[in-house]
């Protein structure tokens, strides 16, 4: 249980960092991974059960591969690193299993829990527009048109110099709004650095992952069972 609590604290801290600055400090996932392996060594020695250590190491290795694949796919690097930390910290945790996929993932030395947390987290991304809305409100964005009201859920309003640094795509300004900017919509030359424009959001995946981490011990793979019964 202590591993689960530490994992929850790490994810909450990472979520706050990601929400405020769109950056997750490396010390969080490193601490989770190191503590996970050290605690597994301690538990294996005291309980004379070395499968605990094997699970932690295999969880780290498998989640490292999955996290690297996420990075290559363009998904946030910080989110993949948190997966690595959780793989070493809580590779296994009690949760209900309803599907054949869940049964397959529940094999020995497969980090069932963190993988299911990330799978459920992807489904929880349906709530991300409300996270984006809340962040816009906190940043002082106020819609002046109907289009801007919609953008409160799907874009972010920020100064041009910040958007350039973060390599965002331009969605527009005032009534000239493009809800689906192309990859080359990053010509900021027509704006001054202090102007505020609407740009594409950087998806804070760590927030739905944190929510998933808290509820997955209760729901297991029930979402998969409901949406894709097999």
Curated annotation (Swiss-Prot):
The chain crosses the membrane at residues 2-18, 24-46, 50-72, 79-89, 111-139, 205-216. GO terms for biological process: proteolysis. The keyword Cell membrane applies. Residues 1, 47-49, 90-110, 217-230 are cytoplasmic. Its main location: membrane. Changing residue 208 to A: Enhanced proteolytic activity. Belongs to the peptidase A24 family. Archaeal preflagellin peptidase subfamily. Changing residue 76 to A: Large reduction in proteolytic activity. Keywords: Archaeal flagellum biogenesis, Cell membrane, Hydrolase, Membrane, Protease, Transmembrane, Transmembrane helix. Gene3D superfamilies: 1.20.120.1220, 6.10.250.3240. The gene is flaK. GO terms for cellular component: plasma membrane. Its EC number is 3.4.23.52. It catalyses: Cleaves the signal peptide of 3 to 12 amino acids from the N-terminal of preflagellin, usually at Arg-Gly-|- or Lys-Gly-|-, to release flagellin. NCBIfam families: FlaK_Arch (NF040695). It comes from Methanococcus maripaludis (strain C6 / ATCC BAA-1332). This is Preflagellin peptidase. Changing residue 77 to A: No effect on proteolytic activity. It comes from the Archaea. One of its GO terms (molecular function) is aspartic-type endopeptidase activity. Cleaves the N-terminal leader peptide from preflagellins.
